[in-house]
Amino acid sequence: MHRIETCVGVVTATLHENGEVSVANVPSFRKAKGVEVEMAGVGKVVGDVAWGGNWFYLVEEEEMKLELANVESLTERAWKIRQAVNAQGWPEVDHVELFGKGMNGGNARNFVLCPGKAYDRSPCGTGTSAKLACLAADEKLKEGEMWIQESILGSKFVGQYRREGDFIIPTVRGSAHVTGEGVLILGEGDPFCWGIGM
């Protein structure tokens, strides 16, 4: 197990023998259910605001299939939703997760719009954590029960959670591949090369 410091807290990662990795994420929760926003030319959109390591607005997508062929239209729709959510009282939300039915054996499929109009090719670890928080709050997923989240490409994460007070601690498991190697240089004269203590 490896402890990784992130800007929102410590997460732990476990490498499994089959090459998959499990990440126990930061405490996650749903902040608001059924948040309505008005979108020009579209009308009312209803979704949940949740924290899973990033702030998400999660909304069911009923008009478009969540597949790669629709990525430009999905990006534009999610961007408009984000602008409406930000303008109507939720400036902290910087990710939009459109979700629908699973198409490849999963419980659900998602399209996640990230800051800068980028989209996540994976099912999104923080987005899956936010989704688990909503499912837990609605009592639609029991503690320890598995949830299979598909990405727009059909790749999958398996998520589950345990309760910790008013929060859940989500664990997300998926495939991992080595894509690079880095070297850290620790200078003798750098007083902070080993970090800082508090």
Give short role names for the model-derived ranges.
Residues M1-M198:
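Active-site proximal loop and beta-alpha junction motif in alpha/beta enzyme cores
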